[in-house]
């Protein structure tokens, strides 16, 4: 056993890798069944959880790298960047209770996922975090962009739903080298609500919508604002009863974020579907399961684990661990006290 680098009741490095691989995609109980199916032996669910969270915590800590704004030229001139939040189920145990099942608080926390890639690339770089606030998400977005090829002479084309925190972080992280475009589909949702109040029938509504889409895509935002202005509701009506006024106010307050003509001319995306999909297959697929509630530090660690795999850093992690780890393993990779909680 010593020559195999395994101690009694321990897990070898290759076995740990298999455990983490299975548990990265499915609940720990199902990972146990997968191990039994493929390797023919039983491992306790608590061991699977401990090994997985230990390595996930290591990956989370490894992702905390300070980053300076690049001074060298970038590998690519145009970088596409997106970030957005999605809710994750979180449980906070009551430290005063001996039985941790009692007194716990359930809530939903926002997991912010970021991605960036060179224009035309189909292999984004991802990042994600729950704790740390919007500043952490912004730094992660910058990190994704730098890894994707952003440099001192690059420009970032950010696309999103117009949330103020995203716009603010694009400005804070990229300054004049960054630009922000509101997702075209998101704008069309405002236009569609207005069209229902303006157009008398389905055919007229469709024609009106197509005219406004064409105006926006060809750089004629003022035409759309004028078309809306002719149908503004009385000021005494509440916003929920005034879709035309709501749409007009939304567009007129974001003129600098609606330059679809320029984006299309530069062959850049006008939609943020990439980040919406990323939330589903990075965060929600593992962290948003029926009946599953996570301690926030464990959710952050599992998010880091899934990001490590999708970014192609999986092999490098295990290779580095093999070089730095001690010969004997005792089911528990070294991890911080916080991530072990």
Could you tell me what each predicted segment is?
Residues 1-341:
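Catalytic center-proximal scaffold of phosphoryl-transfer enzymes
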């Amino acid at each position: 056993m010593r020559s195999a680098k395994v101690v009694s009741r321990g897990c070898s490095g290759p076995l740990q890798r298999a455990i983490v691989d299975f548990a990265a995609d499915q609940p720990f109980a199902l990972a146990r069944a997968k191990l039994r199916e493929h390797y023919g032996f039983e491992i306790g669910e608590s061991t699977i959880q401990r090994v997985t969270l230990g390595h996930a915590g290591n990956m989370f800590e490894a992702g905390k790298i300070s980053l300076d704004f690049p001074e060298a030229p970038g590998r690519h001139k145009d970088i596409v960047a997106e970030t957005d939040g999605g809710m994750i189920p979180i449980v906070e145990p009551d430290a005063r209770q001996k039985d941790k099942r009692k007194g716990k608080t359930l809530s939903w926390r926002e997991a912010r996922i970021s991605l960036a890639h060179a224009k035309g690339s189909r292999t984004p770089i991802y990042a994600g975090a729950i704790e740390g606030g919007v500043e952490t998400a912004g730094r992660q977005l910058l990190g994704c962009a730098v890894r994707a090829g952003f440099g001192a002479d690059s420009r970032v084309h950010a696309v999103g739903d117009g949330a103020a925190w995203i716009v603010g972080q694009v400005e804070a992280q990229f300054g004049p080298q960054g630009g922000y475009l509101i997702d075209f589909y998101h704008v069309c949702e405002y236009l569609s609500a207005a069209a229902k109040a303006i157009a008398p029938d389905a055919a007229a509504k469709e024609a009106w919508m197509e005219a406004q889409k064409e105006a926006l895509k060809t750089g004629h935002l003022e035409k759309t604002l004028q078309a809306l202005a002719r149908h503004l509701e009385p000021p005494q009506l509440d916003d929920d009863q005034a879709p035309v006024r709501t749409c007009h106010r939304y567009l007129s307050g974001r003129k600098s974020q609606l330059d679809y003509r320029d984006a299309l001319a530069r062959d850049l995306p006008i939609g943020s579907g990439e980040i919406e999909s990323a939330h589903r297959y990075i965060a929600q697929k593992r962290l948003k399961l029926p009946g599953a509630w996570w301690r926030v530090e464990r959710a952050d660690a599992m998010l880091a684990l899934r990001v490590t795999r999708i970014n192609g850093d999986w092999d490098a992690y295990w290779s580095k661990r093999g070089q730095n780890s001690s010969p004997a393993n005792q089911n528990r990779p070294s991890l911080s006290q916080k991530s072990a909680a």
